[in-house]
Amino acid sequence: MALTAEKTSGPDLRGPWDFEESPLSQAAKQPLMLGLFLNLQDIHFSSLPTSNSWTFDYNVDVVKRAEELGFEIAFSRTQWLPKGGYDGDSSLDSFIALGAMAAVTNSMLLISTIHVLYGPLHPLHLAKYGATLDHIAKGRWGINIVTGHRAVEHEMFGWQRIDHDKRYDMAGELFDVLHRLWGETENFSYEGKLNPWAISNGWITPKPSFGRPTLVTATGSPAGIDFAARHSDLVFVTSPGGAHIDSALETLPEHVATIKNRAKIYGRQVKTLINPIIVSRDTEKEAIAYADAIEAGKPQAGTRAFAANNYDSDAHAWKGRGDPRHKQGRNLGGNIEIIGSPEQVVEQLVALNKAGIDGVQINFYDFRDDLDYFGKRILPLMKEAGLRV
């Protein structure tokens, strides 16, 4: 493991879990937290018509509607791809876009994704940006920690992809330093051991509202799990069994327990989130027909489409896809697929919760229309089932 800026003196460095009134602590009071997995890229998983748009205005409208419905979290990915990497070559930066939503929302946690090693990003920059966004959002902003898994992305920044486990060691050093910068009451100096940066008399204000911003990690590897256990508050998990809900429910309990037990070793707690796409209509037959229509429009391999491109990745989290030991899903867009009537959707959400999942970051094929349907038909049943209070 990395040699990092472990705290030996000075103030008690706290995080959002240490404050009952923090937005994170309040969100976690829900038996199953609800989040949106926004699409800020012009990516299409099917040619079936949809209202979706990568634009800021569209995504703001969706987030505001989700907030009205009581959703706790908004999140988006970010990627660095060459021309042709996206279906329409248009994308917004998650760090900026989610931060900007602080001014037009009131209660949702806003989680920006940023590749912390590209550049590499200096901790003083990130600490100041984070403290500023935390101030604007009144403690509702957080960061999804990404180290980068695609070779093409590292190459875009001028070097070869860094070894998988070393990336997490480098990120661990960065976030130990960030925590110090956010929490220290005096100037802080540090010489990077794994990263090519140093700090001399670093000082960051304003201090974050609840110790530091909410930290999120999406991972599935042993190195990533250890990093998340040490640093993160929320962990995006993926199904070791692939996208089919049956396989997910078989494999998730052990996987989730491993992550939570690892956090306990460090005297910490984490909550787990997973990313389902929810495809629902009034009857099972209608929901399957909707899923069939989406699947029929999927791009074929070799076409100029994000969903058909096979970028070189060393990520561990999606290895369940294509594993012949497990039932396979339809590859409709989420990490797992929940397809059925509203009643069946809720049954599957209950099963995920029993498997140790604390929240869902939902994809919808049509974010505007399917979110409205979710609010009208599924959310009331979730309340009846005890998933929402």
Where does each model-flagged region fall?
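An alpha-helical appendage that flanks or caps ligand/catalytic pockets
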Residues: 2-40, 68, 165-208, 239-354, ...
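N-terminal beta1-alpha1-beta2 module of alpha/beta enzyme domains
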Residues: 2-104, 207-213
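Hydrophobic faces of well-ordered beta-strands that scaffold small-molecule active sites
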Residues: 32-38, 74-76, 110-113, 141-145, ...
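Conserved, mostly hydrophobic/aromatic
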Residues: 34, 66, 70, 101, ...
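Active-site mouth loops of central-metabolism enzymes
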Residues: 43-57, 114-124, 160, 209-222, ...
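Catalytic domains of carbohydrate-active enzymes, especially glycoside hydrolases
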Residues: 57-78, 227-238, 351-357
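Glycine-rich, proline-tolerant flexible connector loops at the mouths of alpha/beta enzymes
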Residues: 73-95, 239-250, 362-375
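Alpha-helix-loop-beta-strand connector modules within alpha/beta enzyme cores
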Residues: 85-111, 170-172, 256-264, 374-389
